Amino acid sequence: MSQTMSKNNREAKEKKGQPEPLSGSHKVKNRNHSRQKHHAHHDM
């Protein structure tokens, strides 16, 4: 599922070329969320 989303995002970015900051922001947010969840679990 993640691979498909990444491919779609990449295609959209290459096609539009403008939604670069949007894609970056989304990626960072997603990564941050995953990291935070992991950290919380570790903390527990």
From Swiss-Prot:
Q: Where is the composition biased (Basic residues)?
A: 26-44
GO BP: any one term: sporulation resulting in formation of a cellular spore
Instruction: Tell me the superkingdom of the source.
Output: Bacteria
User: What InterPro entries does this protein map onto?
Assistant: SASP_SspP
Principal cellular location given in the protein's record = other
Expression induction = Expressed only in the forespore compartment of sporulating cells.
Q: Which UniProt keywords apply?
A: Sporulation
What is this protein's name? Small, acid-soluble spore protein P
Q: Which organism is it from?
A: Bacillus cereus (strain ATCC 10987 / NRS 248)
